[in-house]
Amino acid sequence: MKKKLLFLGPPGAGKGTQANLFCKKYGLIHLSTGDLLRDEVSSGSVLGIKAAEIMNKGELVSDELVLSIVEGRLANINEGWLLDGFPRNVNQANSLKNLLEKINQPLEGVILIKVADDYLIKRLVERGRQDDNEQVITNRLKIYREKTSPLIDLYKKQGILEEIEGNADIDVVFSCIEKSLG
């Protein structure tokens, strides 16, 4: 079983849910940049306030900020890990690759969870987070298509991408992920 993983997919695809299940079952450390950023916002720090302003508009937090958060976490992990919500663009992917080479922890697998837009919007609106209103969601999906979708080709070319249909029940999606990482 691969132990250094990345889950990709649009907002609301179920990356966090699947990552939590996978990490719990296989003892990996779950690194969710969304959770790390929300924790920073909740702390009320200057950085958290700045991040909240960006996130509430549905925009992406700067590469430098997210990379420094991820680097701080990865530096303290010797066992397996699963990244969820990072990288979000080719620049971040290249920075992540350099970081992982530096700490001798190369990425072993990437799971792309694919979900139809209408299903995503419904799922996100029902989730009820402050940054989950329809206008913000539509903007987040647009940014995902523009910035994050190119990662699919990047990881395909590296031979480490597995695509999973995410419209099914949680258990079905989880089973598909397990089989693909076998």
From Swiss-Prot:
It holds the Pfam family ADK. The keyword NAD does not apply. ATP binds at G12, A13, G14, K15, G16, T17, R127, A168. Keywords: ATP-binding, Cytoplasm, Kinase, Nucleotide biosynthesis, Nucleotide-binding, Transferase. It is an enzyme of class 2 (transferase). It catalyses: AMP + ATP = 2 ADP. Its EC number is 2.7.4.3. It comes from the Bacteria. AMP binds at T33, R38, E59, L60, V61, G85, F86, P87, R88, Q92, R129, R140. Pathway: Purine metabolism; AMP biosynthesis via salvage pathway; AMP from ADP: step 1/1. One of its GO terms (molecular function) is ATP binding. It is found in: Cytoplasm. The keyword ATP-binding applies. Residues 126-132 are annotated as: LID. Gene3D superfamilies: P-loop containing nucleotide triphosphate hydrolases. One of its GO terms (biological process) is AMP salvage. Residues 32-61 are annotated as: NMP. One of its GO terms (cellular component) is cytoplasm. Its main location: cytoplasm. SUPFAM superfamilies: P-loop containing nucleoside triphosphate hydrolases. Consists of three domains, a large central CORE domain and two small peripheral domains, NMPbind and LID, which undergo movements during catalysis. The LID domain closes over the site of phosphoryl transfer upon ATP binding. Assembling and dissambling the active center during each catalytic cycle provides an effective means to prevent ATP hydrolysis. Catalyzes the reversible transfer of the terminal phosphate group between ATP and AMP. Plays an important role in cellular energy homeostasis and in adenine nucleotide metabolism. Belongs to the adenylate kinase family. Monomer. This is Adenylate kinase. It comes from Prochlorococcus marinus (strain NATL2A).
